[in-house]
Amino acid sequence: MPEKDAMISFEEHKRQIEEYQKLFPFYQTYAKVLKGILEKACKTSFPEAFIQARPKAVSSFAEKVVRKYTKYRDPVNQFTDLCGARVIVQTLEQVEAVKLFIKANFKIVEEDEKGLQLGEDKFGYRDMHYIVQFRPDTFSLFDVTPEDQAAIGERKAEVQVRT
């Protein structure tokens, strides 16, 4: 169990950053493939969906390592958001459709449904967060190259879906 007030050493911080820098190209590939698949999923039914995906910036990773070190002693292997995607759609029905697509095509490691939130304007919005991994059949369904499949492997990504 990590000590509550433990701080990461300079050497360990540097090692974690260097390790992530080595893995960064794999997460760039992951983001590219993930965005492409989400775009294909949304293209016909709701082409106005806004989709973005990216790997976590090295500077953001470095900051998070320090901030979360008491909980994560091996961040490069424990963080689940080193690749992230966001899908923004216009209606709750579209959120549900994207949600079904994600559940049908990815292994869900973790799911956090923020539920129907009411803002000051009284319009409801849904905010879903998933930690996912690619399933092997998803690779073949979307013609992901063997090279990209190898780069992605069993890495995890965070996918947010919201209105």
State what each model feature region is.
Residues M1-T163:
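Nucleic-acid processing machinery
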